[in-house]
């Protein structure tokens, strides 16, 4: 009975495989939104102010960072929790594949969240005159929370690896 239970439990990791594959659909959606934004600004780029162009650029960078985060979670999550990725010898392999354990992945995800939060905060500061002070305070507090959490996770990871 114990062997059957353990085999079933071990096999249940494959439930995560379609979830990781589903993240690729989210990635596709981000790609569509990215190019939708590009095609939206192209006809009006000469009429845009510099501030508006910077804000659009920050939004595009934000989408790119989220996309990178999705790729990192998809691949390393699959490798850590489901099965090793067997890409052919003739295809190029990402240098970090197989090297991110769950602790490293958490740190990279936390760093990505801080970077994404920083982009959002920069967008807020560029439009500061149109945003309530209370909202700015909350954005700052949330960002500081992300930064402190990422720092604490990195510190704890460093302490446990000693």
Curated annotation (Swiss-Prot):
Pfam families in the cross-refs: UPF0114
Family: Belongs to the UPF0114 family.
Transmembrane segments: 10-32, 53-75, 136-156
Protein name: UPF0114 protein SO_3997
Organism: Shewanella oneidensis (strain ATCC 700550 / JCM 31522 / CIP 106686 / LMG 19005 / NCIMB 14063 / MR-1)
A single cellular component GO annotation: plasma membrane
Subcellular location: Cell membrane
Keywords (A to Z) from UniProt: Cell membrane, Membrane, Transmembrane, Transmembrane helix
Main localization category: membrane
NCBIfam families attached to this UniProt entry: HI0507
Membrane topology qualifier: Multi-pass membrane protein
InterPro entries: UPF0114, UPF0114_bac
Organism superkingdom: Bacteria
């Amino acid at each position: 009975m114990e062997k059957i239970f353990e085999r079933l439990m071990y096999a249940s990791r494959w439930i995560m495989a379609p979830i990781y594959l589903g993240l690729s659909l989210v990635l596709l959606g981000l790609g569509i939104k990215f190019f939708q934004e590009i095609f939206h600004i192209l006809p009006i780029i000469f009429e845009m102010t510099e501030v508006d162009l910077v804000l659009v650029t920050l939004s595009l960078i934000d989408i790119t960072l989220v996309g990178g985060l999705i790729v990192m979670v998809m691949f390393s999550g699959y490798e850590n929790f489901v099965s090793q990725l067997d890409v052919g010898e003739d295809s190029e392999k990402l240098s970090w594949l197989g090297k991110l354990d769950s602790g490293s992945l958490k740190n990279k995800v936390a760093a990505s969240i801080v970077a994404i939060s920083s982009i959002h905060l920069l967008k807020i500061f560029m439009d500061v005159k149109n945003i309530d002070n209370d909202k700015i305070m909350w954005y700052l507090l949330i960002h500081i929370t992300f930064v402190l959490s990422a720092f604490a996770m990195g510190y704890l990871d460093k302490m446990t690896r000693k």
